[in-house]
């Protein structure tokens, strides 16, 4: 069972720096794939990425919450054009690269959201999306 990066990810990249098997890839193009993604076939479930994420966006696959209760002020990102996600968020990753996420929104304190769609989206990134080619 792999770890999953959810839509709470704001493209920081700290997780990628600590992964011992280099299975974490930044989403590109960011308009379509706004998070970082973990290859479920390569992830060894070491958990090194979890404490590194400043957005607390990483969960074990079987622990991704379907009823995540926001503490307030955290953001969710979605592919550009997703209804209700119309705020831009500028993020600088650990390498100093600036990413502009064009489809985000701030969660209200106590708001409950389902983060489980990230499980399939994470897998799709490596099957249908760019996967490791995004590193080129």
Question: PLM ranges: what are they?
Answer:
Residues 1-12, 22-45, 60-69, 133-136:
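Ferredoxin-like iron-sulfur electron-transfer modules
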Residues 18-19, 23, 52-53:
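A structural motif detector for beta-strand N-caps
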Residues 41-42, 48-136:
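Flanking helices and flexible, charged tails adjoining ferredoxin-like Fe-S electron-transfer domains
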């Amino acid at each position: 069972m792999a770890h999953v990066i959810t839509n709470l990810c704001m493209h920081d990249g700290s997780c990628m720096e600590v992964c011992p098997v280099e299975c974490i890839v930044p989403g590109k193009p960011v308009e379509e794939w706004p998070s970082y993604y973990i290859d479920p076939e390569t992830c060894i479930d070491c958990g090194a990425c979890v404490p590194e994420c400043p957005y607390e966006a990483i969960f074990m696959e079987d622990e991704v919450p379907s009823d995540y209760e926001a503490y307030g002020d955290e953001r969710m990102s979605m592919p550009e054009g997703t209804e209700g996600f119309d705020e831009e968020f500028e993020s600088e990753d650990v390498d100093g690269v600036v990413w502009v996420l064009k489809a985000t929104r701030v969660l209200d304190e106590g708001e409950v959201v389902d983060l489980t769609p990230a499980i399939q989206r994470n897998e799709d990134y490596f099957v249908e999306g760019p996967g490791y080619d995004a590193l080129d």
